[in-house]
Amino acid sequence: MEIAPSTSRFKLYDQFELLEFPDKYVVKPIESPEEGFSVNRRDGNIKPLDENASSGSPTRVSTIYGVGGTIRLLAGTYLLVITSREEVGNFLGLPIFRVTAMKFLPCNEALRFATAQEKKDETYFRTLLQALETTPGLYFSYETDLTLNLQRRCKLAEGWNRKPMWKQADPRYVWNWHLLEDLIECKLDGFIIPILQGSYQVAELKLKNSPAVVSIMSRRCTRRLGTRMWRRGANLEGDAANFVESEQIVEINGFKFSLLQVRGSIPLLWEQIVDLSYKPRLKINKHEETPKVVQRHFHDLCQRYGEIMAVDLTDQHGDEGALSKAYATEMEKLPDVRYVSFDFHQVCGTTNFDNLGVLYEQIGDEFEKQGYFLVDADENILEEQKGVIRSNCIDCLDRTNVTQSFMGQKSLNLQLQRIGVCDSTECISTFEDDYTKFRTIWAEQGDEVSLQYAGTYALKGDLVRYGKQTMTGAIKDGLSAMSRYYLNNFQDGVRQDALDLISGRYTVGTHSPSQLQPIGSQPSFLPVASALLIGGVTVTSFTIHQAGRNTQQYLASALWAGVTAGVVAMIKANGRHLTSRPRLCHLI
């Protein structure tokens, strides 16, 4: 049974010449220039090159490495092209690339005839495209589909890898799926690159005399794509926010092992809207559809992965505790899914990584029964993974990544013992250098997944890298926490709109009046309020220091203290209106 399409008749073009003419863009594969196509710069229409031959000299010629698709805004079409790439390794023997730069090229003239409001809206949409051009963690391959895990691809019918790449891919993990419609309609199969958002990390281990390659491929689902505070919980279809499938692949002595784990936000209807406070209150939405939402979510998981064990790592007190309790209540209605509550902070604190052994005592037997996927050098299937662990904390980032790396380590130990590389007394931690490499790729995977959802690197990364917290790591976590606060409150509204646009949740159309929600008072009022607050604190401190001189100083000090308190109260009362909020779509 084939694992990689090395003998496939189908292969994507991997390098292109982009010619820019006044009236069109022309894209030609360098290896087959006669197979190119053109995009009309006036209306965005795409035609095979032989139907619209080039004439005259281009105004600019450049090299690109892929076409990501097209998107239509008010003024017309924009063409996404990959302008820079980096080879990051091999997935089952075939090269993988990371997007390091991409650009949306405008193909429109309709803006000349637009109303003032449409021009204003188009300016905002262009801002969203600019934000998307710097999207982190985008991967692709010209020779194999990255969206399918090893077990799934090995069980597909013979010849599946001869189909066009976009037909092989699982749409839920294709970041640019919404952009591919025009290219698919024009049957430009050799140009259509399914782009995956997630992470790919790889390490080469020595392991006595048995060299091994360990890689982690994480795949972000696009069905509830979003940012940390603006996409929580699930939608009515049961799609969870920050849902990521992570696959740990071990290649050793001709064997290939695969372990799947998934993460995703607690699949209830809940929200946590930013309001300038450090930790906004959680709100559980009481909705008659909630039981069905949970059922839909886990039914889908069971269909795809088999037995599911839901591991809830949230706190058992405060807002998190209330959410966890509501989750547990709904899970009682699903007898076929095992639910395990484990208060990570209470048991492990911030430093005791080894205390995850307490969790393993609860779930280890079932985890080992779920097993892993294994094929030998002749591609015979020796083992199948019968189920997965679904982990979550509040963000499904920091605590979740520590836990998933721990489970990955446990599985690796079992795999090495399975083929005799280690005996029953040995494990990956026996080999110090290899153990460091293994933990590093899990930590870097956690950082990349966190960057996509929260905008910063993961917290608790030291627990994954070193098994303990270090002073440097504590400082890094503090800086990341402050960055998250700033991004969540003042940047993520725009970023959420960009993600809603790229995922197709919001489709641009000509509407009168504009369907964009008003921006609110943040741009004009927040700087003034901030200046008053800083000024008030400064003057109050100074007048208090001078207050012993006379009564007027006391009165001045009291006045400025009152002004400062008033500004603080005003900001607190209007916190939600002073943050960056999405303008395109509702929360659910």
Curated annotation (Swiss-Prot):
InterPro entries: SAC_dom
Tissue specificity annotation: Ubiquitous with a higher level of expression in young seedlings than in other tissues.
Domain text: The phosphatase catalytic core motif (or RXNCXDCLDRTN motif) from the SAC domain is found in metal-independent protein phosphatases and inositol polyphosphate phosphatases.
SAC domain residues: 129-455
Positions of the UniProt region annotated as Disordered: 37-56
Major location category of this protein: endoplasmic reticulum
Motif (Phosphatase catalytic core): 390-401
Function: Phosphoinositide phosphatase that hydrolyzes PtdIns(3)P and PtdIns(4)P.
PROSITE patterns: SAC (PS50275)
Species name: Arabidopsis thaliana (Mouse-ear cress)
GO cellular component: endoplasmic reticulum; endoplasmic reticulum membrane
Keyword line: Endoplasmic reticulum, Hydrolase, Membrane, Transmembrane, Transmembrane helix
One GO MF term attached to the UniProt entry: phosphatase activity
Gene responsible for this protein: SAC8
Keyword Manganese: no
E.C. number(s) listed in UniProt: 3.1.3.-
Disulfide bonds: none
Membrane-protein topology: Multi-pass membrane protein
Protein known as: Phosphoinositide phosphatase SAC8
Intracellular or extracellular location(s): Endoplasmic reticulum membrane
Transmembrane segments: 524-544, 555-575
Basic and acidic residues compositional bias, start-end: 40-50
